[in-house]
Amino acid sequence: MEEQEDTTSTIVQANQVAENLNNETFRTTKPGVKRLLLTFAVLLSFILGFPFLWKSVEIYRSPLPFAEIDSLNHESLHFPYHFQAIFLSPDPLDSSRLHSSILTEISKSTPYRDLCGSSLSKFSLSVVVDSPNNCHRTGSKFSYECGSINRGDFDSSDENHIDETLKKFVGEGRVYTVVVEVVGDNFVPRGVIGKHRHAWVVSKMSSELKTIVAEIMVKVFYHGGTEEGSIKSEFIPVGADGRIILSFNLLNSDPHDWNFDWDFKSIDETLLVPVIEALSPIANITVESQVLFYTPKASFSSWDEKMKSHVFYTRDLPFFVNSNEWHLDTSTAAGGRSNILQFVVYVSSAHECPLKLVLPNGLISSTNGFISPMWGGVIVWNPIDCIKQGSSRTFLSPEDMHNILEVFLGQLRQLLGLKSDVSFLGSFVKFKLLPSEKGFTDWELDMLSRQHTCFNLHSTATTLTSLSKLVKSLPRMIIIDEIGRQSGKTGD
C-alpha cells in the first residue's frame, strides 16, 4: 500500500511541474506585429540579396557563334574565274555556237573537286571570233580589241616573243585566254602554254577544237596541270607565321678525300632572288646556307659492274638521310612556327665515288637527287673523275652551282605540288610549257595562291570547330568578351 501511495504522489508532482513549465515558457496569445515585421524583413533581405549572390558565383561566358563555326566545315569556297577564247579565223564563225560548245566541254572536264571542296562552277566565259572583216563576241566582255593580234605573229619560231606579244593585248587582269589560229588542213596542230595567263593553239577548224580549248582552261589554268596521283597541295610547306626558310647545306662526307666549299651569296643574288620575289604573295621566304664536314649517309651502296659506279636504290631513300650526323637545323629565327625546307648537296666519299641513284625502271636518275615531302630535297654530287684532292679547299664552279640550283628549283616546285614537265599531253594536242625565268609562271602562282588560301581556311575551320566542341563540353569555362569578338569575325 505504501508503494502505491508513493507512485501516485510522484505522478501528481510531475503533472504539477509540467503545468508550471507550460505556464512559464509558452505564449498564450498570438505573435505581435513586431515579430511579423522582423520575419518579413529577414525574408525580404534574402530575396533582394539572392540576385547579388547568384551574380557573384556566375561564370561569365561571352556569346559565341557556334552555329556559324560548325557550318565552316560544310561550306565550299568558290573562286571566280574568267576565261576568254579568241579565234583568229579567215572565215566568219558562229561565236554563240562556239560559246555553248566550250561551256559544255568545261562542265565535262571538271569531275573532281579541289582542296576547298569546290568544283569549277563560278566562272565567266567570253568567246571572240576575230576575222578580217567581222568581229563577233559572245559572253562576258573583256579588254581585248579585235584586230590587235595578227595571224602572222604565230609564224615566228621564237615562242617567247609570241608569248610577250600576246601579253600586250590579252595580259591585263586575271583573265585566262586561249588564242586559236584557225589554219588549213595541211598544218600540223600545235599548242603552247605561255608563261603568263594565256596559251595559243594553231589548228584546223574541227569538232575537237572546243575540247582542246576547254582542256587548257580546266586542266591547265584551273588545276595547274596537276593530276591525281601527283604530290597534293596538303604538302604546301608554309609555316603558321607565313614563312618558309630555305636551308641550303653542302655536306662533305669525308673531308680527307676532298674539301668542297661554295660561294653561295653570288648564287643567292642571281638565281634565288627572282624565285623569292615570285613566291612573296604566298609566303615570306628567307634563305640560309652552311657547309658541314664528316657527314656520312645512313644507307649503304653497292658496286654495279655494268654501270661502273656505286649505286643506291629508291628503296634506300628512307635511310639515306643521317639525322645523327647531319646537323641541318641552322635557323634560330624559326621559333617553331616557320617551316624549314632542307636542300642538301651530298658530296660522296672517294671509296663510293661515283655514287648514283637507280630509278625503279632500272635507269640512272638524271638529277641524281630525290625529295622528301615537307622536309626538302637531296642531290648526290660526284667530283670529276673522283680523284682525291686532299684537305685543300676547292670551290664549286659557277656552272656546277647553276646546275645544282636548277635541280633544287625543280624539287621546290614538286614540294609545292607542281610538276616540272616541259609539256602537257592533252586529248588531241601535246602542248609545250614555256618555262619562266623566275621558276614559276603566272598561272602556276595563281593556283598556288588559291591552294594556299584553301589550305589556311581548311586548317582554321578545323581548329575553330575543335575549340567550339571543347567550349560546349565545359559549361563552367570563362569566355571573355575579346574571345567573343574575335570568334564573331569567323563568318566575315
Which sequence ranges carry the predicted segments?
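Long, solvent-exposed N-terminal ectodomains/accessory regions
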Residues: 2-292, 296-307, 311
